[in-house]
């Protein structure tokens, strides 16, 4: 298996420095042709949602259209994305420097994400929990 420094750095990032996770990921990648090895494949295997999907989710929430939100949530789930991953990655995005948002909105969104995570832990239905999350986000974000 041919691995370059870019792939090694990506593995280190997604495994968060956990050697066992890195080894498991390498074992999984070894079963895949090295010609296909790229960062997108690693993200897919690790269940990482592409950033453009998260940003689009937030943009759809800004439109404050309930029918569109239902379609967005259904498409998100049909694409196989994890609501837990959405909550984690959205929290990271909101707290990053790349997110141009007032601090007050960021705090409200983080609180909503925390509530959503609790609902998931308590066994909430992913579709309903995700739709609830989208509706609450749309209440916080200003309309386009």
List the predicted regions and their residue ranges.
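Conserved beta/loop motifs at nucleotide-recognition and modification sites
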Residues: 36, 40, 47-49
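C-terminal helical "lid" of AAA+/P-loop NTPase domains
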Residues: 8-14, 20-32, 41, 54-59, ...
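Helix-rich C-terminal "collar"/helical-bundle subdomain used as an assembly and partner-interaction module
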Residues: 56-144
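Short, glycine- and charge-enriched coil/turn segments that flank and shape catalytic ligand pockets
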Residues: 34-36, 100-101
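Residue-level hotspots within the lipid-embedded alpha helices of multi-pass solute transporters
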Residues: 14-15, 80
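Conserved small helical "lid"/interfacial subdomain of P-loop NTPases
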Residues: 1-6
